[in-house]
Amino acid sequence: MMRLKEKYNQSIKPALVKEFDIKNPMLIPVIEKVVISVGAGELAKDQKVLQNVADTISLIAGQKAVITKAKKSVAGFKVREGFPIGVMVTLRKENMYAFLDKLISIALPRVKDFRGLSRDGFDGRGNYNFGLDEQLMFPEVEYDKILRTHGMNISIVTTAQNDKQAQKLLELIGVPFTKGK
């Protein structure tokens, strides 16, 4: 599953150096980490469902997910301090490349009527965020073992100086963006 890392080292790095005229090799944009998170909302009230969500995210990521807890109480959301509110996992190195490879080559093509990811998900600092509506597009997830379908947020953190560099890096890796802009 190291296809993506080899592709990055052999063809993407030289292309980025050439396009952005980067003199210092330490300034070549690289993907630092990928964070997958699920805000449980109503699902958090049922511990069994929340554990099922954590298990599903662990299957998808290939690494154990952590149940996140509220840092402080918010009456408007009916949340108390220490109350479980979501699930997250941070992927780095080999797990990150394996997940991105699976996402780009297997999961996203399985989405019905998929036209590409929006280019609006860049944050101005070279990071990209997007959401997926359901977890069933991943091959590890079995429909029968799911208690409730849920979406997830995926954040790709890069060392790019700006959005233009980050977008080019992700395009070269193979992230399917929508046409235009």
Swiss-Prot record:
Signal sequence, start to end: none
Any matching Pfam family: Ribosomal_L5_C
Domain of life: Bacteria
Keywords: Ribonucleoprotein, Ribosomal protein, RNA-binding, rRNA-binding, tRNA-binding
Gene Ontology process terms (BP): translation
Disulfide-linked positions: none
Gene3D superfamilies given in the database record: 3.30.1440.10
TM helices/strands, residue ranges: none
GO MF terms, alphabetically ordered: rRNA binding; structural constituent of ribosome; tRNA binding
Keyword Cell membrane: no
InterPro entries: Ribosomal_uL5 (IPR002132), Ribosomal_uL5_bac-type (IPR020930), Ribosomal_uL5_C (IPR031309), Ribosomal_uL5_CS (IPR020929), Ribosomal_uL5_dom_sf (IPR022803), Ribosomal_uL5_N (IPR031310)
GO cellular component: ribonucleoprotein complex; ribosome
Subunit structure: Part of the 50S ribosomal subunit; part of the 5S rRNA/L5/L18/L25 subcomplex. Contacts the 5S rRNA and the P site tRNA. Forms a bridge to the 30S subunit in the 70S ribosome.
Function comment: This is one of the proteins that bind and probably mediate the attachment of the 5S RNA into the large ribosomal subunit, where it forms part of the central protuberance. In the 70S ribosome it contacts protein S13 of the 30S subunit (bridge B1b), connecting the 2 subunits; this bridge is implicated in subunit movement. Contacts the P site tRNA; the 5S rRNA and some of its associated proteins might help stabilize positioning of ribosome-bound tRNAs.
Family from the record: Belongs to the universal ribosomal protein uL5 family.
Protein name: Large ribosomal subunit protein uL5
Species of origin: Campylobacter jejuni subsp. doylei (strain ATCC BAA-1458 / RM4099 / 269.97)
